[in-house]
């Protein structure tokens, strides 16, 4: 037996969202109608889907529609759908809480800047709560399909932190939302204004949106409402129409509907595919990454329809994980209506759709990246800033398209004195020096650390460009991207670095002489660093720094070891190699020191400085400070 009346509190995040939304989204308040119509549309989609297995849920009322009615005297606006409806528990859960992963992290991103917060909140998806932008009280009456009339509920709130829920009787299946408008919001009581908003945002909704029909009364010179209802939208699925019949504004409105995003997309592609598998795809590239893109519970995937019947919201099997940010719709003519997620994983048709959608998305990105128009290339720059790290995952996830994905990658490099990732691998290859047969890169935690790495000194001396890689995904990506255009990708921090034709015979002879001259010092340094360094040697790769650490061939880099440890994973305990610059005063001083504390301290300082320069952490910072103080005294 359900309680007839209860007063309950909103989840803390809902209170915060209501406050921020009312203040941040007020300038674009008409979106409340778009959000409520979208919810009503989703409710009818869910009913259609559940009715496939249980036709009795339709309750002899298969004419699915949304009704919108304004009452000027009562100053109310009512949105009604005959979709799936809600039970008492569903109403409490859906209307009183935000059931999304990453919600707390989202609120931590809010800055207090009204314009920035408005974009974030719009991206988060305000949904039902947008009603409070224009209403000071909202009443929801709902009954879930399949439950009795006595199981209906009324949910009501003024948005002040609490809501009431009551048991009521309701014969009609579905949901009615009544907005009691705030003072000054009479604009939304105008049928003309409401129709304009619907046609702007919701014309593409695939079921009719109906309003009371009005006719011109010559005697009063006003429009008079009749008892008849009329559709005020086209009521046909946008993706089923011919591309030539759809405007850019309509494509944008549809994107905003399915993505719950206030911004326009960067690009879209709309195609009907025939052949082994027959389907229609409408895919969008968003302009902004969702706040929970990196949350493991992030709901990704396309809306899946079968013969225009909604099946599921987040069919993640239709695109690979690295394209999880793509929004859109796929309507298949071949899949069964009762398709399950398990069946999607095994279906040959789904595999064909996945391959087709992947190729279309990559083609869109290639078109933007290679465009002769600066505005289109600027869109790719925006895309890369938002989704570049996700796209890098494709190097490891999508071997079939590895070459295409590699051409889309962008990096910072020593060619430009900026942290902006705007260098393509093809552009790097085009600038390679005569005799250069490798693509060189350095990895670090930050752009500054990469730019100032001691490993770059010999490359600057020779005028060789080096890619500066600072994303956490880079080291993992490089384990799959071994070459590009026949050129091997090589870390400048490799101990066996071979500059090939870029190193002349005189340099090689000088290196051999230095190794012989410094053998005694190097052997003593090895003894000092036993257990910390795999080897010690002199190098000519340094021009300004006294020392650097490099990795032996086949060993994991120190940077990757640190990343794995930060992620709580085990990393091989590979010791680095210490390389010393024989021309540096700090190193030359070693020759004058006998074995003992002074020699040992200087060697330890040179090792620790090299570790710090590559972003590493000292095991004993206090001991390092004491040694440096001795040297300075």
Curated annotation (Swiss-Prot):
Molecular function per GO: ATP binding; ATP hydrolysis activity; ATP-dependent protein folding chaperone; unfolded protein binding
Pfam families: HATPase_c_3 (PF13589), HSP90 (PF00183)
Region named C: 563-633
Predominant localisation class: cytoplasm
Protein's cellular compartments: Cytoplasm
Coiled coil: none
Gene3D superfamilies in the record: 3.30.230.80, 3.40.50.11260, Heat shock protein 90, C-terminal domain (1.20.120.790), Histidine kinase-like ATPase, C-terminal domain (3.30.565.10)
InterPro entries the UniProt entry points to: HATPase_C_sf, Heat_shock_protein_90_CS, HSP90_C, Hsp90_fam, Hsp90_N, Ribosomal_Su5_D2-typ_SF
Disulfide bonds: none
Region (B): 342-562
Annotated region (A), positions in chain: 1-341
Keyword set, alphabetical order: ATP-binding, Chaperone, Cytoplasm, Nucleotide-binding, Stress response
Family affiliation: Belongs to the heat shock protein 90 family.
Function per UniProt: Molecular chaperone. Has ATPase activity.
NCBIfam families assigned: PRK05218.1
Subunit: Homodimer.
Alphabetized HAMAP family for the sequence: HSP90
Protein name per the record: Chaperone protein HtpG
Species: Cupriavidus necator (strain ATCC 17699 / DSM 428 / KCTC 22496 / NCIMB 10442 / H16 / Stanier 337)
Gene: htpG
């Amino acid at each position: 037996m359900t309680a007839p009346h209860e007063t309950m509190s909103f989840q803390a995040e809902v209170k915060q969202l209501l406050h921020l939304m009312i203040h941040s989204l007020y300038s674009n308040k008409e979106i409340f109608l778009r959000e409520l119509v979208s919810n009503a549309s989703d409710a009818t989609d869910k009913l259609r889907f559940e009715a496939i297995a249980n036709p009795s849920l339709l309750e002899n009322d298969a004419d699915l529609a949304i009704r919108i009615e304004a009452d000027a005297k009562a100053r109310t606006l009512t949105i009604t759908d005959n979709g799936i409806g809600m039970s008492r528990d569903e109403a409490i859960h859906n209307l009183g809480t935000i059931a999304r992963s990453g919600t707390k992290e989202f609120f931590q991103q809010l800055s207090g800047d009204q314009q920035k917060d408005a974009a974030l909140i719009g991206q988060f998806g305000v949904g039902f709560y947008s009603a409070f932008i224009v209403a000071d009280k909202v009443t929801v009456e709902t009954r879930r399909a399949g439950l009795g009339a006595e199981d209906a509920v009324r949910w009501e709130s003024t948005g002040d932190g609490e809501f009431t829920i009551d048991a009521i009787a309701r014969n009609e299946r579905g949901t009615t939302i009544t907005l009691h408008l705030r003072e000054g919001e009479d604009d939304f009581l105008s049928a003309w204004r409401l129709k304009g908003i619907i046609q702007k945002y919701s014309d593409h909704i695939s079921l009719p949106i109906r309003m009371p029909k009005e006719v011109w009364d010559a005697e009063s010179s006003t429009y008079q409402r009749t008892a008849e209802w009329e559709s005020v939208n086209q009521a046909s699925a946008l993706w089923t129409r011919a591309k030539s019949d759809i405007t850019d504004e309509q494509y944008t409105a549809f994107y905003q509907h399915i993505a719950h995003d206030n911004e326009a997309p960067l690009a879209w592609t709309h195609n009907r595919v025939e052949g082994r598998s027959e389907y229609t795809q409408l895919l969008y590239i968003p302009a902004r990454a969702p706040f929970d893109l990196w949350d493991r519970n992030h709901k990704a995937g396309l809306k899946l329809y079968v013969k225009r019947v909604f099946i599921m919201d987040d069919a993640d099997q239709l695109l690979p994980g690295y394209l999880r940010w793509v929004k859109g719709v796929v309507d298949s003519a071949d899949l069964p209506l009762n398709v399950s997620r398990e069946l999607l994983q095994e279906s040959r048709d789904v595999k064909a759709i996945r391959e087709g959608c992947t190729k279309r998305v990559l083609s869109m990105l290639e078109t933007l990246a290679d465009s002769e128009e600066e505005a289109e290339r600027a869109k790719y720059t925006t895309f890369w800033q938002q989704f570049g790290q996700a796209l890098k995952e494709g190097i490891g996830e999508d071997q079939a398209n590895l070459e295409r994905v590699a051409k889309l990658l962008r990096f910072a490099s020593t060619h430009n004195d900026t942290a902006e990732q705007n260098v393509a691998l093809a552009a790097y290859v085009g600038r390679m020096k005569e005799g250069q047969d490798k693509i060189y890169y350095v990895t670090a935690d930050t752009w500054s650390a990469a730019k100032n790495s001691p490993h770059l000194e010999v490359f600057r001396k020779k005028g060789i460009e080096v890619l500066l890689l600072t994303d956490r995904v880079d080291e993992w990506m490089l384990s799959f991207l071994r070459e590009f255009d026949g050129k091997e990708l090589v870390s400048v921090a490799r101990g066996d670095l071979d500059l090939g034709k870029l190193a002349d015979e005189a340099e090689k002879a000088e290196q051999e002489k230095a190794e012989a001259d410094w053998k005694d010092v190097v052997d003593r340094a090895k003894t000092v660093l036993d257990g910390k360094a795999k080897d010690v040697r002199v190098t000519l790769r340094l021009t300004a720094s006294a020392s650097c650490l490099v990795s032996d061939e086949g060993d994991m880099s120190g940077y990757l070891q640190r990343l794995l440890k930060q992620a709580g994973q085990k990393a091989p305990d590979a010791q680095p190699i210490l390389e010393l610059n024989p021309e540096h005063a700090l190193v030359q001083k070693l020759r004058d020191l006998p074995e003992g504390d002074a020699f040992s301290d200087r060697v330890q300082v040179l090792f620790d400085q090299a570790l710090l320069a590559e972003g590493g952490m000292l095991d004993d910072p206090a001991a390092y400070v004491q040694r440096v103080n001795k040297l300075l005294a």
